[in-house]
């Protein structure tokens, strides 16, 4: 399976960064730095996929090219 597109953006309200995977509903994570947010969302992705497999739910294919985009402040 190809990898998923990841967005990383700063959150002034949370004083850190949020990363999300648009293809996996509600799969997002927070980190104090972009690198921490990326590591956290990769852990969240693994948990999301494991839960979907365990519950025999469909796993959506990636709709976007695998990339990591970061919005700057």
What are these regions (language model features)?
Residues 1-5, 35, 39-73:
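Short, charged, surface-exposed hinge/linker loops at domain edges
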Residues 7-9, 30, 70:
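Generic structural detector for well-ordered beta-strands
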Residues 9-24:
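Short aromatic-glycine-(Arg/Gly/Cys) micro-motifs in beta-strand/loop hairpins
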Residues 22, 28, 57:
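Flexible, active-site-adjacent loop/turn segments at secondary-structure boundaries
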Residues 25-36:
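A short, exposed loop/beta-hairpin motif centered on an aromatic-Gly-Thr core
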């Amino acid at each position: 399976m190809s990898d998923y597109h990841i967005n990383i953006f700063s959150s002034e309200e949370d004083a850190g960064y949020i990363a999300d995977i648009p293809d996996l509903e509600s799969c997002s994570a927070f980190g104090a730095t972009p690198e921490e947010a990326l590591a956290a969302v990769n852990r969240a992705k693994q948990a999301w996929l494991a839960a979907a497999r365990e519950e025999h739910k469909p796993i959506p294919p990636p709709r976007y090219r695998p990339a990591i985009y970061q919005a700057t402040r």
